[in-house]
Curated annotation (Swiss-Prot):
Belongs to the PsbE/PsbF family. Pfam families: Cytochrom_B559. This is PsbF-like protein. GO terms for molecular function: heme binding. Keywords: Membrane, Transmembrane, Transmembrane helix. GO terms for biological process: photosynthetic electron transport chain. It is a multi-pass membrane protein. Unknown. Resembles PsbF, one of the subunits of the photosystem II reaction center. However, it encodes asparagine rather than histidine at the site PsbF uses to bind heme. It comes from Prochlorococcus marinus (strain SARG / CCMP1375 / SS120). Its main location: membrane. The chain crosses the membrane at residues 6-26, 66-86.
Amino acid sequence: MVLKTLIVIAPILIAAFSTIFWLSYWGVFKWEDNQLGFENYQDWEDSGVIPENRPKGGYPVFTVRTLAVNALGIPTVFFLGAIFAMQFVRRGIFIA
C-alpha cells in the first residue's frame, strides 16, 4: 500500500522539486539569510533577437507557462508512461 501511495505522490513531488530547483537556479528564489526572497524579474544579457523595446526591469521568469510546464507537464509524462505500461500488463508480458 505504501508503494502505491508513493507512485501516486511521486509525480507531484518531482514537479515541486523541479520547480524549486529551476527557480533557484535562474535566481528567482534567493536562499540568503535564512529568508526566502522572490525576485521575479531577470535581465538576461542575450534575451532578445531585437534589443529595442525590452522591458526596463527585465523579463518575468516565473509565469503561467513556467507553472504549466513544471506543475502539469511532469505529471502528464508520468501519466502517459503509466498508460503505456498498462498495455504490457494487459497483454501478459508482465505478471501483475
